[in-house]
Design a protein with these regions (language model features):
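ABC-family P-loop ATPase nucleotide-binding domains
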Residues: 90-148
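The feature captures the beta-strand-to-loop junction immediately N-terminal to the Walker
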Residues: 43-45
Length: 297
């Protein structure tokens, strides 16, 4: 499901003209390039298409149209699925491990399918994450199951690490260790991480590439700094916000002490000293973008 594409001389994950219909839902004309060496956050409201996109990257479903390429490999070519699997670590929403086997047994069972699986690394991560290698996978909590699958994914020495909503079931203490592990994984500079999430604040400080989906459509794909340059939150007295160019306003709503709007940035930091201009957080952007067309002004 991929083709060879280069960005700055480096191979990457690439989707071109991808469409996928699942019942009434449709992923529409998605074209993205995720460079090697980046931590990419895939964001969007529930049912925006994040999991469908990840399944196509993993070869678990195929696009109706378009191509998906990983490291120059296309799933349609003979043996490519095995080669892609060998360089891809997966931490899915659904459970992949056998509930009746211990964590150690699961590692030995599934590790056979990866040429670089290292049991000693798997054991090190299980210990770091506070998991007993002898316990059956089915006896773990939801958060512990994700930790176990995360430990296994890391033990296969992947080039691409793909995680679907991993932090939703983590306790607060582990979330920091999770971020530390991701940063350690990236130290070589030749790997990439894709994290699908609708819980945004804890990932903001490590992400350097962003893909935002809304109702199956691609809203933004690019580096995080370009995203921060592109949009602004403007707050102030309602009549002053109404003076902004209407075509720049994505969504605005009246609040108790004025109006708050998400706008396309065209130098609004210099517009009026009475207006407060800030860079939107991902959470603010998602909130306002999901309500576009409902502006109160």
């Amino acid at each position: 499901m991929c083709k060879t594409v280069f960005w700055g001389g480096r191979r990457m994950i690439s989707l071109s003209g991808v469409n996928k219909r699942l019942g009434s839902f449709r992923l529409k004309d998605i074209s993205i390039e995720i460079p090697d060496g980046y931590i990419c956050e895939l964001v969007g409201q529930n049912a925006s298409g994040k999991t469908t996109l990840i399944k196509m990257i993993l070869g678990l479903c195929r696009p109706d149209d378009g191509t998906v390429v990983i490291d120059g490999l296309n799933y349609q070519e003979a043996e490519s699925d095995k080669r892609i699997r060998d360089i891809t670590g997966i931490v899915p929403v659904n459970e992949l491990m056998n509930s009746e086997l211990s964590l150690l047994e699961n590692g030995r069972c599934y590790g056979r399918f990866y040429s670089r699986y290292d049991e000693s690394i798997y054991m090190e991560y299980l210990e770091r994450f506070g998991l007993d290698r002898k316990i059956k996978f089915g006896k773990l909590s939801k958060g512990q199951k994700i930790k176990a699958q995360f430990a296994f994914a890391l033990s296969t020495a992947p080039k691409y690490l793909i995680l679907d909503e991993p932090t939703a079931n983590f306790d607060i203490d582990f979330k920091q260790d999770f971020l530390n592990v991701i940063m350690q994984f990236m130290e070589s500079g030749k790997k990439s991480v894709i994290i699908a999430s609708h819980i945004l604040d804890e990932l903001d400080r490590i992400v350097d590439y962003l893909i935002y989906l809304d109702k199956g459509e691609l809203v933004y794909s690019g580096d995080i700094e370009s995203f921060r340059d592109k949009y602004r939150i403007i707050s102030g007295e309602s009549y002053k916000v109404k003076l902004l160019k209407q075509e720049d306003i994505i969504h605005a709503e009246d609040r108790k002490y004025g109006t708050k709007a998400l706008v396309v940035n065209h130098g609004y930091s210099k517009y009026d000293g009475a207006l407060t201009v800030t860079v939107p957080t991902l959470e603010e952007f998602m909130y306002h973008y999901s309500k576009r067309g409902e502006s109160a002004i």
